[in-house]
Amino acid sequence: MTFKRRRIREVAFQTLFAMVSDPEVDREQLYKELLPLAPQEEVPAYLEELVTGVSEHQAEFDQEIEGSLAAGWSLSRVEKPNLIILRLALYEMKYVDDVPVAVAIDEALEMTKKFSDDKSRKFINGVLGHIGGPKTTSN
């Protein structure tokens, strides 16, 4: 079965959220619970790329996010779902060549509709708009 990237992003969000609560969570088991995979079917490569990429670049992304927050705000004040959405968007903005920055931002805003609220949408749009620079080449 082929999954649309939007669905893969949602599963990546859910996986990363679970990993915040339990860093030892079994990712493969989570994928099986969140995606209707046939027994022989493999986890979509893009899902693995997102989850691994966000995890590997988390410190870099958190530093960028913190630098974009209003005076007096720290990363600890950002709600966990919003932080994960920001990290996912930053990964796509900086490391996924075939996802334009505008698309990464739009997809983050769509995810916010599903996993957060309207106030958070404005916050995420502001942070990503502030950061939205050129992509970094992948290793």
From Swiss-Prot:
GO terms for cellular component: cytosol. InterPro entries: NusB-like_sf, NusB_fam, NusB_RsmB_TIM44. GO terms for molecular function: RNA binding. Gene3D superfamilies: NusB-like. Keywords: RNA-binding, Transcription, Transcription antitermination, Transcription regulation. It comes from the Bacteria. One of its GO terms (biological process) is transcription antitermination. HAMAP family: NusB (MF_00073). Involved in transcription antitermination. Required for transcription of ribosomal RNA (rRNA) genes. Binds specifically to the boxA antiterminator sequence of the ribosomal RNA (rrn) operons. Belongs to the NusB family. This is Transcription antitermination protein NusB. The gene is nusB.
